[in-house]
């Protein structure tokens, strides 16, 4: 049963109708609360602890009911630090799940898991709120249209195209460029499509969250002069937050995105950085609640938790949510239960390679490991499909020959294989691209490359028309015309040196 947004914020009950409990036990972020007989709160109800600590500081902690233990006890997980809480403190049952502000008032603002603004720009209009726990849309409401979502990033659009209203995973270990790729996608999509985005920062670095906010202000995605004209809402539950906040912040972001889809009937982009931290927070909470761990120490409810989040991210007849999720891969092991469970829900995977990052090829997207259900001739067309397959075949052949080259050298290869290697190296470099958000690092202005331009460029390389150009001419350029211009400049420079 889907609940619609309400037009009033959840109010803590008045003194006469308050359902009061008392803290019986505190284990880190987990509280046991005793309620009067027959007054037990429901699962997922929000509880509020108000009072003062031993030095007189005001305490206001919101918790969420996770278990009913019997003997009039409930076990709840805190959404903020439990410092200063004591046994015997009063706990108020709000009688409803956590609800957060939704709609136009959220654009250009930063929120925490509770939907409270944390950007020092004053209060937010909370007349329209929505509970963070909802069921997924019914089958009859779903939209099954297949269409490509152009990103302007060559390697993505050609080899693993994104589906409009689909779910995309960015897989990679630490430091290979997941967050930079997400920032570039937000930038390109806001400029090219003019759509609304919601960014959920789940358990990532606070510094990155701050950088992203500043970047958005500079690029105009967040309009400081007129906040209402901004194109993005930000929801942060970063590394320093308790596991309860990190576990629920993804749902807060999703609830805001659902409102734009269902009520405003818009196409929305939902970015989650990082979905692994959502699983990790769930694992911490599961251990604190006393559940028996499953494979590799993860929670036994891993698939259920992931499914309840992912199934709400979908396209309906009203609008679509296209979700791009960064997935940290522990120890670069794709068979780890967290990334493996995520794989099952995705329409496309963009796998980032440490080998390519070490070569300085950015975005470090692996052309052979990245996949998409959209790369079919009936969806993308014969020309796109054939070009993508030939690029993959050439890259695969180069990969197979690398051992022979390392042992015997290039001269021992046949003429045909030498030509394949030369073209594969050009393709590898042409798959790199200067990003708008990385201009400060690369010194090169960012480039947005349309799909037709991308296909034309790779067809020219594969046809052999550009065999005479040096491979460094293809590195960090936009379309193929820039590569030929760069080759001419390199030739002029080399002549001047002589």
UniProtKB/Swiss-Prot annotation:
Name recorded for this polypeptide: ATP synthase subunit beta, chloroplastic
Record carries keyword Lipid metabolism: no
**Gene Ontology terms describing biological process:** proton motive force-driven mitochondrial ATP synthesis
Q: Quick one: where is this thing mainly located?
A: plastid
Where does this polypeptide localize? Plastid, Chloroplast thylakoid membrane
Reactions listed under catalytic activity: ATP + H2O + 4 H(+)(in) = ADP + phosphate + 5 H(+)(out)
Cite the record's note on assembly.
F-type ATPases have 2 components, CF(1) - the catalytic core - and CF(0) - the membrane proton channel. CF(1) has five subunits: alpha(3), beta(3), gamma(1), delta(1), epsilon(1). CF(0) has four main subunits: a(1), b(1), b'(1) and c(9-12).
Organism lineage string: Eukaryota, Viridiplantae, Streptophyta, Embryophyta, Tracheophyta
Q: What does this protein do?
A: Produces ATP from ADP in the presence of a proton gradient across the membrane. The catalytic sites are hosted primarily by the beta subunits.
Q: Which organism is it from?
A: Elaeis oleifera
Q: Which family does it belong to?
A: Belongs to the ATPase alpha/beta chains family.
């Amino acid at each position: 049963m889907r609940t619609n947004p309400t037009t009033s914020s959840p109010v803590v009950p008045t003194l006469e109708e308050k359902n009061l409990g008392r803290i019986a036990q505190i284990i880190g972020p987990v509280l046991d609360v005793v309620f009067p007989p027959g007054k037990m709160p429901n699962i997922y109800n929000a509880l509020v602890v108000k009072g003062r600590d031993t030095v007189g500081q005001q305490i206001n902690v919101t918790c969420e009911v996770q278990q009913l233990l019997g003997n009039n006890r409930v076990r709840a997980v805190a959404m903020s630090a439990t410092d200063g809480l004591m046994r015997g403190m009063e706990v108020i049952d709000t009688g409803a799940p956590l609800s957060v502000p939704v709609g136009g008032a959220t654009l250009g603002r930063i929120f925490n898991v509770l939907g409270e603004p944390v950007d020092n720009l004053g209060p937010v209009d909370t007349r329209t709120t929505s509970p963070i726990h909802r069921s997924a849309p019914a089958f009859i409401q779903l939209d099954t249209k297949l269409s490509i979502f152009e990103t302007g990033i060559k390697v993505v659009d050609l080899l693993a195209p994104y589906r409009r209203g689909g779910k995309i995973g960015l897989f990679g270990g630490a430091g290979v460029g997941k967050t930079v790729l997400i920032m570039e996608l937000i930038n390109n999509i806001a400029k090219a499509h003019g759509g609304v985005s919601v960014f959920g920062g789940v358990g990532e670095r606070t510094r990155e969250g701050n950088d992203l906010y500043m970047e958005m202000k500079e690029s105009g995605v967040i309009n400081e002069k007129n906040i209402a004209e901004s194109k993005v809402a930000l929801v942060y539950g970063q590394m320093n937050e308790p596991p309860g906040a990190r576990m629920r912040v993804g749902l807060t972001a999703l609830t805001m995105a659902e409102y734009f889809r269902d009520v405003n009937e818009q196409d929305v982009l939902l970015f989650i950085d990082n979905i692994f931290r959502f699983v990790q927070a769930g694992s911490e909470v599961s251990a604190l609640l006393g559940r028996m761990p499953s494979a590799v120490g993860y929670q036994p409810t891993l698939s259920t938790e992931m499914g309840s989040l992912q199934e709400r991210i979908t396209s309906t007849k009203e609008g679509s949510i296209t979700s791009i999720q960064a997935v940290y891969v522990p120890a670069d092991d794709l068979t780890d239960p967290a990334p493996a469970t995520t794989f099952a829900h995705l329409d496309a995977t963009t796998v980032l390679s440490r080998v390519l990052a070490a070569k300085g090829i950015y975005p470090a997207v692996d052309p052979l490991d990245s996949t998409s259900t959209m790369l079919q001739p009936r969806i993308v067309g014969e020309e796109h499909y054939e070009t993508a397959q030939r690029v993959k075949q050439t890259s695969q052949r180069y990969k197979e020959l690398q051992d022979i080259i390392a042992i015997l050298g290039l001269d021992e290869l046949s003429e045909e294989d030498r030509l394949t290697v030369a073209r594969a190296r050009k393709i590898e470099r042409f798959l790199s691209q200067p990003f708008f958000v990385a201009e400060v690092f690369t010194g090169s202005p960012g480039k947005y490359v349309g799909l037709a331009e991308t296909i034309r460029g790779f067809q020219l390389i594969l046809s052999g028309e550009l065999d005479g150009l040096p491979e460094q001419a293809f590195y960090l350029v936009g379309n193929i015309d820039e590569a030929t211009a760069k080759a001419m400049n390199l030739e002029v420079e080399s002549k001047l040196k002589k």
